[in-house]
Amino acid sequence: MQICLMDETGATDGALSVLAARWGLEHDEDNPMALVLTPQHLELRKRDEPKLGGIFVDFVGGAMAHRRKFGGGRGEAVAKAVGIKGDYLPDVVDATAGLGRDAFVLASVGCRVRMLERNPVVAALLDDGLTRGYADADIGGWLQERLQLIHASSLTALTDITPRPQVVYLDPMFPHRQKSALVKKEMRVFQSLVGPDLDADGLLEPARQLATKRVVVKRPDYAPPLADVATPNAIVTKGHRFDIYAGTPLTE
């Protein structure tokens, strides 16, 4: 995959070359998207819209830390949707990891989550965030136990994953209508890189075959159900709904 690669660390240790080789990235000087190694983190920038700033994964500070400390925890809609109740903390495969926010929420309340991400740039951002998170004295211990990254396409990986999870979570990219500054900024940068998930409909059936309990699909409230498969089971929040489908129980 071609992208502009930039190193702003001032170091001469070849870290950017190692990163490019690991994720299969080629430097393209004229690419409007840039992956930038800064002294703090790895970030994605849209070079023709510098005011949008950089997108990076931060599990330790910022909005994620605030959500972990002061958010709804088990009361969050995503936690309810995957079926967390009492001592039941399902094993989850997040098949469309993105920036890892929902996966982190589930991990922070006790679920083991395997994140799948096929885009190498997004996977590199997630890996950078995980590396910093794993090293953090406060959250590193449980984060290493509960949150892992698998760089692979969900369309193929969903048939290969073992052991089978109880829940598969899907949040395919869908064009956003909201005008909120955060969504606008992040989605403009993000969609410029990955575009809409045009093949997302193909995820529902393999997800249902893989999950032993349920599949949860997050959709904007104005979006049709994934693959046009309606379900009476949904958790509705402001602006979104979590459609819930039955999985395929383990056979004895």
From Swiss-Prot:
Catalysed reaction equations from the record: guanosine(1516) in 16S rRNA + S-adenosyl-L-methionine = N(2)-methylguanosine(1516) in 16S rRNA + S-adenosyl-L-homocysteine + H(+)
Record's subcellular location: Cytoplasm
Signal peptide span: none
Main subcellular localisation: cytoplasm
Keywords: Cytoplasm, Methyltransferase, rRNA processing, S-adenosyl-L-methionine, Transferase
Gene3D superfamilies: Vaccinia Virus protein VP39 (3.40.50.150), YhiQ-like domain (3.40.1630.10)
Residues annotated to bind S-adenosyl-L-methionine: R101, D102, E117, R118, S153, S154, D171
Top-level class of the enzyme under EC nomenclature: transferase
GO molecular function annotations of the record: rRNA (guanine-N2-)-methyltransferase activity
InterPro entries, per the entry: 16SrRNA_methylTrfase_J, SAM-dependent_MTases_sf
A single cellular component GO annotation: cytoplasm
EC number: 2.1.1.242
Function per UniProt: Specifically methylates the guanosine in position 1516 of 16S rRNA.
NCBIfam families, per database record: PRK10742.1
Family: Belongs to the methyltransferase superfamily. RsmJ family.
Record-linked HAMAP family: 16SrRNA_methyltr_J
Name of the molecule in the record: Ribosomal RNA small subunit methyltransferase J
Organism (species): Salmonella newport (strain SL254)
